[in-house]
Amino acid sequence: MSALGSLVRVHTWALNEKRQTLAGLEQLAEKLRNDLEGLEAELQQERSAATGSIEGTIAFPAFVAAALERRKKLRVSIANLDLATEAARQEVREAYQEVKKYELARDNHERRERDRLALRERKALDELGTTLHQRKKIMQSESEG
């Protein structure tokens, strides 16, 4: 494998690692968003339950305080993950550009090498054709003379 091929392989590996990191961040953010939705639903459910009993009415304010604190922490975590996700997306874009740069260089190198070999082959065939033509002329002149 050429040096450019190795660079493509290494940078592709790095790109895949960055994509996996990004996917992990996106999954975690989605989980936190689902947790937030679940918390909101639980809050509504507890609010409905609290109106039906005295014990619920007494315990509900403590539950609300804890739920609001949890919601605040979830929102902060989601915001931080959104920032980290955007940074990871930028890293993936940059890594992708690197891979494309090295793939293009590798492809150009391979094309130039194929062209060089094709030119060498054409020259060899031209030389062979010229030699055969000269031999044919010599044999014709010997047979005529």
Where do the model's predicted regions map?
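Charge-rich amphipathic alpha-helical interaction elements
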Residues: 1-145
